[in-house]
Amino acid sequence: MNGPPLFQASKPVFLGSAALIFAVIFFVASSPSLAASVFSGVQSFIVRELGWFYVAAVATFLVFAVGLALSSMGRIKLGPDDAEPDFSTHSWFAMLFSAGMGIGIMFYGVAEPVLHFSSPPAGDGGTIDAARRAMQLSFFHWGLHAWAIYAVMGLALAYFAFRQGLPLTPRSALHPLIGDRIYGWPGHLVDIFAVLGTMFGVATSLGLGVMQINAGLNYLLGIPVTITVQVALVAGVALLATISVASGLNRGIRRLSELNLTLAVFLVVFVFAAGPTVFLLQAVMQNTGAYLSEIVGRTFTLYAYRPNDWIGGWTLFYWGWWISWSPFVGMFIARISRGRTIREFVVGVLLVPSGFTFLWFTAFGNTALSMELSGAASMVAAVEANVAVALFQFLEQLPFAVITMTIATILIVTFFVTSSDSGSLVIDIITAGGNIESRVWQRVFWALTQGLVAAILLLAGGLAALQTGAIASGFPLAVIMLLVCYGLFTALRQEVQRQTNMQVAMPVASGMGHLPVPWRQRLSAMLHQPTRERAVTFMRTVVRSALEEVVTEIRARGLDAALSIDDEKVTFTILHGNEEEFRYDVSLRGVVLPAFAMAMLEGEREGPERTWRAEVSLHEGGQGYDILGYTKEQVIADLLGQYERHLNFLHMQRTG
């Protein structure tokens, strides 16, 4: 017996992505000094010539996400109309909460506010006003803009995968623009750019992570801080991630994620308790207010009248980093958000992770600034000497330093492993055309490649090379994401138009497609509580017969129609060339018998308190009404009524 194929992927995407990534690896490995020079030139060019584009793109993503949530499109579900959320609101919030954590906040939680305080982009450093502006800038870089980028990509992936039935890959978001060409080279190129962005974005995080692990081990065990040690750490931790991938330890990774959440919450609560608690509670409120009050002006600030290098090393680096991470984080939040409305999705994704990040930066950043201003510790000197060491020198000033530094080091390692494992999974799904059940070796390949890219970038210039990799890889993805916004808006506008022009068919009382129904039949249908056996008989003798007649007639008129039949579901489809197909499903569903109908029980049932419904679904999901009890002519009338609405919708699309 032949087993599954050894290679389960989209060959153009897999091979194209691998070739480009290894071309970069070969270039950096063979000429590290030249590579460092090229990276520096690329970063300078992007900052000088394309900084405005990054700023405009990220502003667009935030306005677009908020606009969708506030518009009538916000009511549309990420899935069929009758889909229920896969996770409870509490569990969903918890997963979004965990998405807001990562290697980045460990690396920059102390360092970024201190660096902005000592060397602000404008004005004098080392002052109370500089401290206030430092927290504003940190919130700006890690707040709503970052999560708007993720929300746009996640929303597009969720909508087109769960509501339109397209592959769970970035190419699907361009379907409204290029149609089925997403399955050809235009779609392959989109997915290749998504893979490159994810690869270099995750590699940037891994590089930052090993720099900080090295700093922690130096503090705890005296291990020297060198590139050699950091490359060895990349290899070691990437190996751990590879083992988890090869072993299929989904439960283990889930437990690691839960451990991440527990340790991160412990650290932030500890700092709030051990630090200046009342000041921190006041600061989180004031920081949030200051951030929100200046968000518009800050969004569009490019320091055009007084150019400096600050924006390239900070704001543009972050925008490129977040954009390069968008397929990774976007796919995660898409997969956990099926059944949510667009409004729920945007509000949750923007506010929950941002809220946790604000708490983290206030706890670590404001406490570090308080130490500096009070003279309790020289945090500026520590950070300027070695950014990666900042967290550990900060924790050294608080009680139980050895314990908290050990916990912080463990947390960075677990973040590293889960990021690498999840990143390799996302890249594998994209290169496999949306298939989540591809071969294990493919996922192992991407896990090892991530570690290799991180190590090579460290050898090519450390933090500067990592920053350049993030900024450069984000540019093509930013262009794609703008097209994604347009494609998603086009699809949602059609969706609203469909909802306007295709009103839900009413149940029996409406007359079913203009066919009069005697009142006694209406009453009988309303009170009827059929068994499963009778429901299946109805599907076989009435629904199937009715739809077979319509299929025959439709085909006789030269249209392409199809019918799919089993005992509990019948699906009728009419194709319209390049226009949207019409689909009419009738499915049996068991429901709890209403209390008033208990006395009507008759016959054998699968449960003493269950009855059955024959519910209608269209392309956009369940319509919420039951046709069990209709005659054959009434079923045909209902189908034609829905088809008439669909044709009207297609007409409205053609005419504008």
Question: What residues fall within each predicted segment?
Answer:
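Amphipathic, interaction-prone secondary-structure segments
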Residues: 549-603
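Terminal cytosolic tails of multi-pass membrane transporters
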Residues: 1-8, 70-80, 349, 361-397, ...
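Helix-loop-helix connectors at the membrane interface of multi-pass transporters/channels
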Residues: 1-8, 12, 167-185, 209-232, ...
